[in-house]
Amino acid sequence: MKKFMAVYRGEPGKGNAEWNKLSENERKQRMQQGMDAWGAWMQKNFSQIVYPGGPLGKTLQVNREGISNKVNTDCGFVIVEASSHEEAAKLFLNHPHFSIFPGENVEIMECLPVPVRPQ
C-alpha cells in the first residue's frame, strides 16, 4: 500500500463568511454535527489511517533572508494508505471539513520514498 498525505485547506475569508453569518446556536449545532461526522469518518477509515495528524498552527518560513511569518491555507493533515492516488482521494469525498465545516478542500499527495544516493 502507498502512503498519502491529505492536507485540509481553508482560506480565512471564503467559507468563514457564511459560517460567521450563522447564529451562535446554529454554529454550536454545526460544530457538534461536524465533530460527530469527523469522528465517524475516522472510525470508518480507521484501517487506512496511518497517522491521524491534526490541526496546524501558524506558519513560519525560513529562507536565505532568515525567518518570517507566512500565511498559508493549510489547516490540518492526516496520513492514509491506499492502493492508488485515486483510492486515497475517494476517502475524502464529502468529508466534513468542507461538507459541514467552512473548509475549502482536501489536497491529497503521495508520500514518496527519499531518494537514495548511488554508492
Question: Which stretches of residues belong to each language-model region?
Answer:
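Conserved, structured core segments of small domains
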Residues: 1-119
